[in-house]
Swiss-Prot record:
Domain of life: Bacteria
UniProt-listed Enzyme Commission number(s): 2.3.-.-
Cell inner membrane is among the record's keywords: yes
Name of the featured protein: Putative membrane-bound transacylase BcsY
Gene behind the chain: bcsY
Source species of the chain: Komagataeibacter xylinus (Gluconacetobacter xylinus)
Pathway in which the depicted protein is active: Glycan metabolism; bacterial cellulose biosynthesis
Signal peptide coordinates: none
Gene Ontology molecular-function annotations: acyltransferase activity, transferring groups other than amino-acyl groups
């Protein structure tokens, strides 16, 4: 049976987590730092402090494609059950915990009309279809978005949908050259569709996986591209320029540059350059210091938006300034606890459990998500009827 330890880790385990997760010796910490930069951009955007911070999602998407290329398409032989279990233990426990706690804390006191939408959004989030719910209910950059604590899970739904595509590719296409051809086709078709959506002004393209597949595919194809052999000074210069492009986009991009705008090509291309240039001095100076934030970025992403939404509901006005800083500080504490007690515990169990127990645990996680989704869908239905 799956057992998640509810008690705080022993001091020895805290030490192990700090050493192995936050200061690893066998992982590129600059990529963790890039994830830290991306989550900082997103959080500051949602706090109203950075107008182009939405670009952090695009950065995350490319990085996600890169990691999926490594864990699925570049593994020979591909282990489908282990791949699925790893993803489920990585993602479901923290998501389930967040949706359950936020739902329990909000649904009993919000307005009945809000309760119906919030509960349904939570149900869609648990089955990774939140982007589909959002496209039919609210624009991401509209004012009413702040009323939905699970709206941010649209990007997690896109990610899981891409995982499903990669899973099918890894099963059906055993040869790398075939995978390269399919990824190139996906990249080209998605980029063309994205350009079409931008040209026609599709207001819901931001949530559409068809507009994002080229970004996922771009990150995945990094594994299939030759690594540039640049002199140290040239590599540092290119790396610094790439970091500057991402930071500049976060600082100065207007909302009109959000996906499907072609302007997202620049930060996405910058991510590829950073990934392809390991061990640079600029990376150690600029991104490695952000790596601890990158390690807990999933938990930060899960909790930061509900924290802002709940604060707005409780205070009856949109929080800003020092109040927002306090909310984000609390979010960071909750996120760290979520990482250590939930996210990390799930991965530890997946690593150590016997195969049969691991597979049963994954099935239980899926059943728990489906069960809670059914409860939330029922609450939404009852709230609308009455």
């Amino acid at each position: 049976m799956l057992q998640l330890n509810p008690t705080p880790p022993a001091p020895g385990r805290w030490r192990t987590i700090l050493e192995n997760d936050f200061f690893p010796k066998n992982r590129r910490r600059d990529i963790d730092g890039l994830r830290g930069l991306a989550i900082a951009l997103v959080v500051l955007f949602h706090a109203g402090w950075l107008k182009g911070g939405f670009i952090g999602v695009d950065v995350f998407v490319v990085i996600s494609g890169y990691f999926m290329g490594r864990s699925a398409l570049m593994q020979h032989p591909f282990q489908p059950v282990r791949f699925v279990c790893r993803r489920l233990y990585r993602l479901l426990p923290a998501l389930l915990c967040m949706v359950a706690l936020v739902s329990a804390g909000m649904l009993w006191w919000v307005l009945q009309s809000d309760r119906a939408d919030i509960a349904l959004n939570g149900a869609y989030a648990l089955v990774y279809l939140s982007n589909i719910w959002a496209s039919g209910h609210v624009g991401y950059f509209q004012g009413q978005a702040v009323a939905y604590p699970f709206l941010h899970t649209w990007s997690l739904s896109l990610e899981m949908q891409f995982y499903a595509i990669i899973f099918i590719m890894a099963l059906l296409l055993p040869l790398t050259r075939h995978r390269r051809l399919v990824l190139s086709a996906i990249f080209s078709a998605s980029a063309a569709y994205c350009a079409y959506a931008w040209h026609t002004g599709d207001s819901q393209a931001y949530y559409n996986i068809l507009d994002r597949l080229w970004q996922f595919a771009l990150g995945t194809m990094v594994w299939m591209l030759p690594r540039p052999k640049l002199p140290r000074a040239a590599a540092d210069a290119v790396y610094a320029a790439a970091v500057a492009v991402i930071v500049g986009a976060g600082l100065f991009y207007p909302l009109s540059y959000a996906c499907p705008s072609w302007m997202t090509v620049f930060p996405c291309g910058a991510v590829v350059l950073i990934i392809m240039l390991p061990d640079t001095r600029v990376g150690r100076w600029c991104l490695v210091p952000l790596s601890p934030l990158g390690v807990i970025s999933y938990s930060v992403y899960l909790w930061h938006w509900p924290g802002i939404v709940v604060a707005n509901y409780l205070l009856f006005f949109q929080v800003h300034g020092a109040m927002m800083a306090g909310v984000l500080a609390l979010v960071m504490v909750v996120s760290l606890l979520s990482y250590v007690l939930v996210e990390r515990t799930g991965l530890d169990y997946e690593n150590r459990a016997p195969v049969a127990a691991r597979n049963r645990g994954a099935a239980l996680l899926v059943a728990a998500c489906l069960g809670l989704a059914a409860v939330l869908a029922y609450i939404s239905h009852v709230s609308r009827v009455h």
